[in-house]
UniProtKB/Swiss-Prot annotation:
Descriptive protein name: Probable M18 family aminopeptidase 2
Gene Ontology molecular function: aminopeptidase activity; metallopeptidase activity; zinc ion binding
Family: Belongs to the peptidase M18 family.
Keyword Hydrolase among UniProt keywords: yes
Cofactor(s) recorded in Swiss-Prot or TrEMBL: Zn(2+)
Amino acid sequence: MAATAHGLCEFIDASPSPFHVCATVAGRLLGAGYRELREADRWPDKPGRYFTVRAGSLVAWNAEQSGHTQVPFRIVGAHTDSPNLRVKQHPDRLVAGWHVVALQPYGGVWLHSWLDRDLGISGRLSVRDGTGVSHRLVLIDDPILRVPQLAIHLAEDRKSLTLDPQRHINAVWGVGERVESFVGYVAQRAGVAAADVLAADLMTHDLTPSALIGASVNGTASLLSAPRLDNQASCYAGMEALLAVDVDSASSGFVPVLAIFDHEEVGSASGHGAQSDLLSSVLERIVLAAGGTREDFLRRLTTSMLASADMAHATHPNYPDRHEPSHPIEVNAGPVLKVHPNLRYATDGRTAAAFALACQRAGVPMQRYEHRADLPCGSTIGPLAAARTGIPTVDVGAAQLAMHSARELMGAHDVAAYSAALQAFLSAELSEA
């Protein structure tokens, strides 16, 4: 199934946490004939389509047609996490008769965008069972939480909004008598005894469904409004690209790989973030399973290439002065190649040419993004993955507005173009003299 705007909406609405992103992708892969491998097991020595999951991260690859130990990798990397409000370990508060859940910001969350929204809960419970500990996904898609804003009549300054993340972003979830704890309530909703919950990784999500909005052209809406476009739009586009390569280009001279990592929004320095050994260890095991050696693996990295797929800033119509004037970026105008002289993005001349060629072969336009020199620039998994693996890397994305808001906006037509470019990158060869 090709990537579509409707498909992205369904993907996002089913995936409110990094754990759910991995579960959604895993479900699609299993349906397409992929087999899940556990890292602790011995991996099969025959070609095939496989994936492995480490907490909120996943790596998938199609080596069905590529048994030779020197076939290079073509990798699409993205991240599964998004800035949000997360539940503290001891969240229960009682303030002026209100039952309050203590929250804290995760990543560079745009705090004010979370006020006065109906919020659900998602994440993972670690539960004691008969054999030890098991992990259960949690999804409560009911409006159980809300972070209420202060009335304008009570504000110290009506012209600006300053939020203290310790005091001002806690959520209410009821009044009056309540015996159970918040985690106990979540456990009950998940069908688990509260006494068996050993740990909880819980986070909030906006309950407004993803939607196609804006003026329609030939019956098709031009814009897509959704939470977590940064960076679930890239996870979805990369997943569909990998599955399309399976159908169209399995005899390619590359092993196509999808690597989606948790914790990008907080620096990637975790046991399953982009700074971990997850990608490099999986790639080495692919080579070893094909009968190769570590020497073969190291040689293979030099001919491989990685596209770090993360969303890009479209030029904002209300704040055009916040953008580089010679590099306007539009929605519905094709994927974005991102370049930064101080390596906030990993793109160099060789990898930029590879992605430009991929866009040409996919028949989609490509835009080039440069950040204003007088503003600090964010980064991606690109420089981190490149440093960890030594694989030449290009940073790319799709254009959007309102990055890190609870609700973001992109071009509906960019979904298919973005995935098509990534598909071409996974399968198209770059000839070099």
